[in-house]
């Protein structure tokens, strides 16, 4: 069953100059988010900037959250990723969606108005309830940490 999410358009250019977020294909998990900018923004290597989307969402359902992720092509080809690596949007957040863009590449990168710069997915949320215990039931792995399960 499709879940409907309320979207508020904060910038009148959205839907006129810049399309609403869309799924690129029928199998796409992520919606493309666009840079709602007046002018192009040049991002020097190592720099970060906050880019508005012109949109606010209200998920409302506490069993859902949204995550903003980098677009694979921008990251691989240009070193453009999210400054916070992953953006988490809680179900009760109602403010504008802002994208922290980080140029981890070697060359300057120009973000154009309306350019697709991130993607957003919706994920189920399970809130944990902690149960204080003295010991855990034994497992094969035990307390083995980083690299314990091997490479193969």
Curated annotation (Swiss-Prot):
**SUPFAM superfamilies to which the protein is assigned, alphabetical:** dUTPase-like
Reported EC number(s) for this entry are: 3.6.1.23
Binding-site positions, substrate: 71-73, 84, 88-90, 98
Name the pathway it acts in: Pyrimidine metabolism; dUMP biosynthesis; dUMP from dCTP (dUTP route): step 2/2
Q: What class of enzyme is it?
A: hydrolase
Origin superkingdom = Bacteria
Catalysed reaction equations from the record: dUTP + H2O = dUMP + diphosphate + H(+)
Keyword annotations for this protein, in alphabetical order, are:
Hydrolase, Magnesium, Metal-binding, Nucleotide metabolism
One GO term in the molecular function aspect is: dUTP diphosphatase activity
Q: Which family does it belong to?
A: Belongs to the dUTPase family.
Q: In UniProt terms, what function does this protein have?
A: This enzyme is involved in nucleotide metabolism: it produces dUMP, the immediate precursor of thymidine nucleotides and it decreases the intracellular concentration of dUTP so that uracil cannot be incorporated into DNA.
Descriptive protein name: Deoxyuridine 5'-triphosphate nucleotidohydrolase
Source organism phylogeny = Bacteria, Pseudomonadati, Pseudomonadota, Gammaproteobacteria, Enterobacterales
């Amino acid at each position: 069953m499709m879940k409907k999410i309320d979207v508020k358009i904060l910038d009148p250019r959205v839907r006129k100059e810049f399309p609403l977020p869309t799924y690129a294909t029928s199998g796409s998990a992520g919606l493309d988010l666009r840079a709602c900018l007046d002018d192009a923004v040049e991002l020097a290597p190592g720099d970060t900037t906050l880019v508005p989307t012109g949109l606010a969402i209200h998920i409302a359902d506490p069993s859902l959250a949204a995550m903003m992720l980098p677009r694979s092509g921008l990251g691989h080809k240009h070193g453009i990723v999210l400054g916070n690596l992953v953006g988490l949007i809680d179900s009760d957040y109602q403010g504008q969606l802002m994208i922290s863009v980080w140029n981890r590449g070697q060359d300057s990168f120009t973000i154009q108005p309306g350019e697709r710069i991130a993607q957003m997915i919706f994920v189920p949320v399970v809130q944990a309830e902690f149960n204080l215990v003295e010991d855990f039931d034994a497992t094969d792995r035990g307390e083995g940490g980083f690299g314990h399960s091997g490479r193969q």
